[in-house]
Every structure is written in C-alpha cells, then in structure tokens.
C-alpha cells in the first residue's frame, strides 16, 4: 500500500492504493479476539505507553465488543473498580489512576458505566459539578483546569450530562451560542470561532446540536456537500482537504452525515471496501489505512462505520454517542436527527 497523488476532476488529491488481495469480508471473530487479548497484555510496550489515554482506550474496546455482541468477554468488575479509582475529589475523572481529570475521560467513563448500567459506581453529583465548573461566560467549555477551549469539550459536556439526565445543570443557551459561533462559510465547524472546518469538529458540533435539539440551525445541504467531498477515489474518507483517507473518518464523517440526514450522498460500497481493506487478516483489528499497524481506536471506528453502513453482523450504533442504540434506548436518550 502506498500513498499517491490522484487526479480527480482536474484536481490532484492525496489517496492510497488498495491491493487486489486486500480483505473484502468482515473478520468479526478475529477482531473480537484482538480486543479481548489487548487489555490482558499489561506488560506490552504499546499498553504501557498508552496509559495517558487509558480511559478512552477502555471505552473504545468495550464499545466495539458490545457492537460485536462480545461484551461478556471483558472483565466488568475490574473495569468498574478502575473507573471508581479514577474519580477525583473535584468530581472529574482521569485517563488513569494518578493522572489529572479531564472532560474527555469523564465522558469516556460515563459512556462505559452507561454500557454496564452502573453509573452508581461514581459520585454523579460531583461529575455534574465538575462539568458545570468548566463552562465559561461565553458558553464554551474548557477541557480541564488548564483552560484549553475547544468545541470537542462542548460535545463532551452535553453528552456526559445527557447520559446522566442532568443537561439542565449548565447554561445550554450560551453553550449553543458558542458552538454556532464556530460555524464556517462552508457549512462546517472548527475548534473555535474562525478555525478551519474539520470532520472531527463537525462530528462534535452536529452531535452537540442533536443533543440540544438545534439541528435546524445547520445548513444540511451545504455541510453535507463538504462532508461528501471528503470521499476519495479509493472510497476512503479524509478529515479535511489535501489529507490521506483514514478509517477513523469512516466514523467522524459518516456519523455527521447520518445526523444531518445525508448519509445516502456518498458511495457506500466504495467506503465499505476501503474499511474492510484496513483489516489485519492475521491479528485482527483495523488500521488507519491498508497495511498499517492496527489499534483499538481504529478498530472501534471501523466497526462503528460499518454499522452505519448497515452491516448486519454488527449492532446498530448511535451516530451521536458512538454507543449501541439499544443502550441509549434503555437510558431513554434519543437525540432527534435530520430525516
């Protein structure tokens, strides 16, 4: 597999070539085995070096196992004890024991506990107070006490509170104003007002607007066109112009299109072929691109992307929360999407 510049309608684009012998069927059992064994290898270099994002790693692994109907293979009690140990006095939750709390890992922990129907393991009132404390006067959210502002954190805040049934704990109107101020002329969203549109930020902002019932504020046709332009001749999707395709954008772009009701605008079969080509036939798991090293992050978003494409072997996934739809139905959290 190599990258190349591909001429498409007169414009050169970065893309990848997919070999003729690339996998074209879903290797579900291998992926389940890969994830089940990943967390057990606690002395591996890769495992040790990912401690700084452990909570999100647990979320990726559990969610993809649940989507594949394999959640029972994970160590529930060990995970619940770990999450409880990561909650700080301020209410926030950290990536790992001894690390600083952050909104990203607080959301991951709440998603995990929602999967397991075990939110009672943590002090919910303190989590709510922590999220409240990070909202600024303009409605934006910092990720932690150090103050970085990003629309990702706006999404983390409302997603966390929605799962806990506490969305009214923040100033929702001001939060909406801030996110809308990050909308660009091309229909997309950036991390702050005036920042470049990016598929990851668009997912966070459309997800935020779905949770807060504000999708009518989005120009779905304009944004849908920008998102569809992310598809390359290989079938893969990139996050912004002039970038290579990456399996994770099979989630960020595809989920955004689903939220705004424009999923049918892309070539679904070519995208499906690209995602399947990113599997490792020997070890299981998905990589960012065909032939690269696999990891739990891309494995979740490859499987979740296939779910949005209607893969029958995978449970239906929520495009807003990246969790099984059945879990969101159980907790009665069902954001309204554009039809």
Curated annotation (Swiss-Prot):
Tissue specificity, per the record, is: Ubiquitous. Detected in all the major organs in adult animals.
What is reported on the regulation of this protein's activity?
The enzymatic reaction requires the aid of a Rab escort protein (also called component A), such as CHM.
Q: Which CDD domains match?
A: GGTase-II
Under the heading Pfam families, the entry gives: Prenyltrans
**What cellular component terms from Gene Ontology apply here?**
Rab-protein geranylgeranyltransferase complex
- Repeat PFTB: residue ranges? 28-69, 76-117, 124-165, 172-213, 220-261, 268-310
Which InterPro entries does the record match to this protein? PGGT1B-like, Prenyltrans, Ptb1, Terpenoid_cyclase/PrenylTrfase
Give any GO molecular function from the UniProt entry.
small GTPase binding
Entry keyword Metal-binding: yes
Task: Name the residues that bind geranylgeranyl diphosphate.
Answer: 198-200, 240-243, 249-252
UniProt cofactor(s): Zn(2+)
Gene Ontology biological process terms from the UniProt entry: protein geranylgeranylation
The record's section on Gene3D superfamilies has: 1.50.10.20
> What enzyme class is recorded for this protein?
transferase
Query: In the UniProt record, does the keyword Repeat occur?
Result: yes
Query: Could you say which EC number(s) this protein's record lists?
Result: 2.5.1.60
**Which residues are reported to carry the modification Phosphothreonine?**
11
- Describe the function of this protein: Catalyzes the transfer of a geranylgeranyl moiety from geranylgeranyl diphosphate to both cysteines of Rab proteins with the C-terminal sequence -XXCC, -XCXC and -CCXX, such as RAB1A, RAB3A, RAB5A and RAB7A.
Q: How does it assemble?
A: Heterotrimer composed of RABGGTA, RABGGTB and CHM; within this trimer, RABGGTA and RABGGTB form the catalytic component B, while CHM (component A) mediates peptide substrate binding. The Rab GGTase dimer (RGGT) interacts with CHM (component A) prior to Rab protein binding; the association is stabilized by geranylgeranyl pyrophosphate (GGpp). The CHM:RGGT:Rab complex is destabilized by GGpp. Interaction of RABGGTB with prenylated PTP4A2 precludes its association with RABGGTA and inhibits enzyme activity. Interacts with CHODL.
Q: What is this protein called?
A: Geranylgeranyl transferase type-2 subunit beta
Source organism per UniProt: Mus musculus
Name the lineage.
Answer: Eukaryota, Metazoa, Chordata, Craniata, Vertebrata
Q: Give me the gene this protein comes from.
A: Rabggtb
């Amino acid at each position: 597999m190599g990258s190349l510049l591909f001429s498409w309608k007169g414009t050169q684009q970065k893309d990848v070539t997919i070999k003729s012998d690339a996998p074209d069927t879903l290797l579900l059992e291998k992926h389940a085995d890969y994830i089940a064994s990943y967390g057990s290898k606690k002395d591996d270099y890769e495992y040790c070096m990912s401690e700084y994002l452990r909570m999100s790693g647990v979320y990726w692994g559990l969610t993809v196992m649940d989507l594949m109907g394999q959640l029972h293979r994970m160590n529930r009690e060990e995970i619940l004890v770990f999450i409880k140990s990561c909650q700080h006095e301020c209410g926030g939750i950290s990536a790992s024991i001894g690390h600083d709390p952050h909104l990203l890992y607080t959301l991951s922990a709440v998603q995990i506990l929602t999967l397991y129907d075990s939110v009672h393991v943590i002090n919910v009132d303190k989590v709510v107070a922590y999220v409240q404390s990070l909202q600024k006067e303009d409605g934006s959210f910092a990720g932690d006490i150090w103050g970085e502002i990003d629309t990702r954190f706006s999404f983390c805040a409302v997603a966390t509170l929605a799962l806990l049934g506490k969305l009214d704990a923040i100033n929702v109107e001001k939060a909406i104003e801030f996110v809308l101020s990050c909308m660009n002329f091309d229909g997309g969203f950036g991390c702050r007002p005036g920042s470049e549109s990016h598929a990851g930020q668009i997912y966070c902002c459309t997800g935020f607007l779905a949770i807060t019932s504000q999708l009518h504020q989005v120009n779905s046709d304009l944004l849908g066109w920008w998102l569809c332009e992310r598809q390359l001749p290989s079938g893969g999707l990139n996050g912004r112009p002039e970038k290579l395709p990456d399996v994770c954008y099979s989630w960020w772009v595809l989920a955004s299109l689903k939220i705004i009701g424009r999923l049918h605008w892309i070539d679904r079969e070519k995208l499906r072929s690209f995602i399947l080509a990113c599997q490792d036939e020997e070890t299981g798991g998905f990589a960012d691109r065909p032939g690269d090293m696999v990891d739990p992050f891309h494995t979740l978003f490859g499987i979740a992307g296939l779910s949005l494409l209607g893969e029958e072997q995978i449970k239906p996934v929520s495009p807003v929360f990246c969790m099984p739809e059945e879990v969101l139905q159980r907790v009665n959290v069902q954001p309204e999407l554009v039809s």
